[in-house]
Regions:
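SAM-dependent methyltransferase catalytic region
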Residues: 1-255
Length: 256
């Protein structure tokens, strides 16, 4: 759990006294304890000289109404306070950096988001004046999205002249050359295939590529929202939500 991670990284911490559901780890053999200590040290080294509460990530892969995430909020809040963060800064940091949730039901995701916002607002009455960006999502299915049409509309290789994707009769002017050799095409192809039945498989879906590849593609596509033509912008708006959930599923978390 995230609480156990914190205590192993900070053995002298007293925050566990505030955690109602904290369970003291069972005593381990010397060999196992060495392995655990090595893992904890590796995780601490990722942040520098000590574990940074802003880097701790918690995912509820079937978040429902958000009960577990709300409990995690209290746990994380104690960590931030112990490190001397200002109370008014903590709610936004937790919601935007620490907590992640997925569900197959959009109503459940809405309830979880609402529960977290209300929990955070107890600590910062001004929070909703500039609402934080939550990492809670209801998984979307790809539906009838057509890979070839999306790729042609995106025109990432500028194989067609801008504004001439189609002729007056709607037939495609020309096909992009060898899209199968483009890593971006392969990523989009994977995303569309993985999420074809997302409402059935939910967070059991395992992404094939590292998180960074989906993030890089998302950033590249988002640039087209400012510079692209009408077809490019429409294609980006269809793909970005799918890439966001791909990023959440590909991401490595401290606690799940």
């Amino acid at each position: 759990s995230v609480g156990r991670l914190w205590m192993m990284a900070n053995p002298t911490s007293n925050t566990k006294a505030e955690w109602e559901y904290y369970i003291q780890p069972a005593e381990q053999t010397e060999e196992v304890q060495k392995q655990l200590n090595a893992l904890i040290q590796t995780r601490i080294d990722e942040d520098g000289i000590q574990l940074n509460p802003e880097s701790i990530t918690v995912l509820d892969p079937a978040c429902g109404s958000g009960h577990i995430l709300v409990e995690a909020y209290d746990c994380l809040k104690a960590m931030y306070l112990e490190r001397g963060y200002r109370s008014r800064d903590i709610p936004r940091l937790i919601l935007e950096k620490n907590l992640f949730g997925l569900d197959i039901d959009h109503r459940a995701a809405q309830l979880a988001s609402f529960a977290l916002l209300m929990k955070a607002r107890e600590d910062d009455r001004t929070l909703l004046r500039n609402p934080p960006k939550l990492n809670i999502m209801a998984l979307k299915e790809t539906g009838d999205l057509d890979l070839t049409r999306l790729w042609n509309d995106l025109n990432l290789n500028a194989a067609w002249k801008k504004g001439s994707h189609e002729d007056l009769f709607g037939s495609e002017e020309q096909e992009l050359s060898s899209p199968e050799n483009d890593e971006r095409f392969k990523l989009i192809q994977e995303v569309l295939a993985k999420f074809e039945n997302a409402k059935t498989f939910g967070s059991l879906i395992c992404m094939d590529a590292p998180e960074k590849q989906y993030t890089d593609l998302k950033l590249e596509l988002e640039k087209l929202l400012d510079t692209g033509d009408t077809l490019q912008k429409a294609a980006v708006k269809k793909l970005v939500p799918l890439l966001i959930q791909a990023i959440l599923l590909a991401k490595q978390y401290d606690a799940v």
